[in-house]
Amino acid sequence: GVARLVQISAIGANEGSESVYAQTKAQGEKAIQDAFPGAVILRPSVIFGPEDDFFNRFAGMTRFSPVLPVVGAETRFQPVYVDDVAQAAEMGATGVAPSGIYELGGPDVNTFRELMQQMLKVIRRRRLIMNIPFGLAAAMAWGFELVQTLSLGLIPPQITRDQVRSLRVDNVVSGKARGFADLGIRPVAMEVVMPDYLWRFRPAGQYEAIKESASRLRPQR
């Protein structure tokens, strides 16, 4: 049989949520706990790292767009480094972590807008961050979903209505939850890791630092 079980869920898992995503995460947790009471359940916030689908996605948009559209610019997140989540999962799989639910967030809490500002600073680009109101975003998402249906799934939506619902709620560790401190893990801050993998989105890529140094050496007129 299975000696230990670790489930990766998500912060915000709640059967009473308006978001289907949050509902299904909670339902999955309940099913796991019913079948395997000794399971370790991890609820990370937005995960960042070399192959993440968050910062990489938005950084990629800056290559061809002067505007960076975001939904829920003031919604708060607590991004967590993928290696820290992996370490927590390893502790659960090896029996070091006691059974139960752990909410995993990084050391910093930022709004969506602030996260985009930090990302732009790392990739050395200036873009207008445009907040899209939830009502307009929901209407746009409906259109994207319609296109997906008409294309028989060949054209995926840029955003879904359920994602818009999720973005209405802060994605941060709750005050009473067990987390990294209970596991003895000190989470890594975003600014330590982001330059290591987002440099390729800089205007001159890996040569951006050389370009900046050269510009400082030019004689002033």
Feature-to-residue mapping (PLM):
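Flexible, glycine-rich beta-alpha linker
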Residues: 17-20, 40-61, 76, 110-111
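Conserved Rossmann-fold NAD(P)-dependent oxidoreductase catalytic core, especially the SDR/UDP-sugar
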Residues: 1-35, 39-45
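Core catalytic loop region at the nicotinamide-binding pocket of NAD(P)H-dependent oxidoreductases
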Residues: 92-106, 125-130, 154-157, 178, ...
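Conserved sequence/active-site signature of Rossmann-fold short-chain dehydrogenase/reductase
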Residues: 13, 47-49, 85
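A hydrophobic C-terminal alpha-helical subdomain
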Residues: 135-221
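Substrate-positioning beta->alpha
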Residues: 23, 53-54, 72-94, 100-103, ...
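Substrate-binding strand-loop-helix patch
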Residues: 76-83, 102-122, 131-142, 186-188
